[in-house]
């Protein structure tokens, strides 16, 4: 050992150990890959392809139906009896039914004036209209502001009631349920619900109530949402594309074929008798609106969607608010499916094909499969096949089917078709949270009943005056508050897969993977939407 310095021996020793460990890991990988990894990953590919075909068939079916509806279907006022309500000097207002307008609120500092003002401006006899502001706010300042606004309208002769509760049991469902128990509501035949940021036009009731008056089998009339801030940022444009497809296609198809669709929670008119017959509002899930709609439908009630009747509203413009909203909208339906699937199967009032539509199309494919296949296939399985080239993915499954589905989804918002590519990448990012939420709902895990009110900033054109107190900060200075570790983790995973495919692959998936990596990375850093510090 004379003349040999330890500093030259130790690095070689570590190098040898490192090479030995790497060699052992490589050997274990080769031993496990063929008998275990390859079959499991190939099975995952087949399952994802099956889900893709299911989603494609659903989209094609709805595409065909919506074309037939637009070309040959009669308009709602031709399919159902509709007679406008005319003012009569002799009868006065007695030919108008008594209507209740409910406006649930929770700390709506920026938008509370919008819905209250719009509701008070509805063209309806004042003695036949009751406006009920259900304020669950926990901020005393906001509560005082809302109460003062109600008093201001009451001084003008509007029949407006300001209601508060001692607790927030049941959240929105609890507030709506409590509101219907008030003594002054017993004379009301119909109830209209508007969230705090919704602004109905003055003729809203005159265009919708006659359908309920002259068609006793209709329980719900749903209006379409229109968005005052869709051009605020890229996040709101992406939301507009998804929601426009929902209203233009999904709601229209459900209304035209089975007289069933999910109540959207706002901008809808219910027959109070139908609510009571269905068991009233329930707070067992975070989608009390869908829960009531399914229960009412199982009792034979019909629903009508009016695409021409539009109500202005606001989209969440912060990524944090949007994520909470999507968690609720994804977790709630999955949880409701778990609770009601057997009740739907056993129901004897609803025909067989309507049961199939509700269970398979409405719940299983749209609320569960659509999220799972988007995330599992395009964000997990497809990248993993790059690391295991023995697993093959047919081009019709990886390219053709998603392309067709994307094109069919684009019909709702033609003006944003140039953003279609960005929308795909963004939807893949959001599928991570939606998949997680559906699993939480199906297994009724910890956050299954988490209710976070979607924060609105009053950022639409008609609400600019309400945003003076909002400070928007440059994005780069607030990174610690905006980091989303889940997205950043998937960005790293997809980047590794993309680099491996760039060096060793033959399918050129790295182009998609690098673009998807950027989308996850941007979302992970919170560089999307507007930013308002908490």
From Swiss-Prot:
Substrate binds at residues 195, 197. It catalyses: GDP-mannose + (glucomannan)n = GDP + (glucomannan)n+1. The active site is at 136, 289. Its main location: Golgi. GO terms for biological process: cell wall organization; mucilage biosynthetic process; mucilage metabolic process involved in seed coat development. Its EC number is 2.4.1.32. Coiled coil: none annotated. This is Glucomannan 4-beta-mannosyltransferase 2. The lineage of its organism: Eukaryota, Viridiplantae, Streptophyta, Embryophyta, Tracheophyta.
């Amino acid at each position: 050992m004379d003349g040999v310095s330890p500093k030259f021996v130790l690095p070689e020793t570590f190098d040898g150990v490192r090479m030995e460990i790497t060699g052992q890991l490589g050997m274990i990988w080769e031993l496990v890959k063929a008998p275990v990894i390859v079959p499991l990953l190939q099975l995952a590919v087949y399952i994802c392809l099956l889900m893709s075909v299911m989603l494609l068939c659903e989209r094609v079916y709805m595409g065909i139906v919506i074309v037939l509806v637009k070309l040959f279907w009669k308009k709602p006022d031709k399919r159902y009896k509709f007679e406008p309500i005319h003012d009569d000097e002799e009868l006065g207002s007695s030919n108008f039914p008594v209507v209740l307008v409910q406006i649930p609120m929770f700390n709506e500092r920026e938008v509370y004036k919008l819905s209250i003002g719009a509701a008070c401006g509805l063209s309806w006899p004042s003695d036949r209209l009751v406006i009920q502001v259900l304020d669950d706010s926990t901020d005393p300042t906001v509560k005082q502001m809302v109460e003062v606004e109600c008093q201001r309208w009451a001084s003008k002769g509007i029949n407006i009631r300001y209601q508060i509760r001692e607790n927030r049991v049941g959240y929105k469902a609890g507030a709506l349920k409590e509101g219907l128990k008030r003594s002054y509501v017993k004379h009301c035949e119909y109830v209209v619900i508007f969230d705090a940021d919704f602004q109905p036009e003055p003729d809203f009731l005159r265009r919708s109530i006659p359908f309920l008056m002259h068609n006793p089998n209709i329980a719900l009339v749903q209006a379409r949402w229109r968005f005052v801030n869709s051009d605020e940022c890229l996040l709101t444009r992406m939301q507009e594309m998804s929601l426009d497809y929902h209203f233009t296609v999904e709601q229209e198809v459900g209304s035209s074929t089975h007289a069933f669709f999910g109540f959207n929670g706002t901008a809808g008119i219910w027959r109070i008798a139908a609510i009571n017959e269905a068991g009233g509002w329930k707070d067992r899930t975070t989608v009390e609106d869908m829960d009531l709609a399914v229960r009412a439908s199982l009792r034979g009630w019909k629903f009508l969607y009016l695409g021409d009747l539009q109500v202005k509203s606001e989209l969440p413009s912060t990524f944090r608010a949007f994520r909470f909203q999507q968690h609720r909208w994804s977790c709630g339906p999955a949880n409701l499916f778990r609770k009601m699937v057997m009740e739907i199967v056993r129901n004897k009032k609803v025909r067989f094909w309507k049961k199939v539509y509700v269970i398979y199309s409405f719940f299983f494919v749209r609320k569960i499969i659509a999220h799972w296949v988007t995330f599992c296939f395009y964000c997990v399985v497809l990248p993993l096949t790059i690391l295991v080239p023995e697993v093959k993915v047919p081009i019709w499954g990886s390219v053709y089917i998603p392309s067709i589905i994307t094109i069919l989804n684009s019909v709702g918002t033609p003006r944003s078709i140039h953003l279609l590519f960005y929308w795909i990448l963004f939807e893949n990012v959001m599928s991570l949270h939606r998949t997680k939420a559906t699993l939480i709902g199906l297994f009724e895990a910890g956050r299954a009943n988490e209710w976070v009110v979607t924060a609105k900033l009053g950022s639409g054109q008609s609400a600019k005056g309400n945003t003076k107190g909002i400070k928007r900060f440059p994005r780069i200075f607030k990174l610690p508050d905006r980091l989303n570790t889940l997205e950043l983790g998937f960005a790293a995973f997809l980047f590794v897969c993309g680099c491996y495919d760039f060096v060793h692959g033959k399918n050129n998936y790295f182009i998609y993977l690098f673009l998807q990596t950027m989308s996850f990375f941007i979302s992970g850093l919170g560089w999307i939407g507007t930013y308002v510090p908490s």
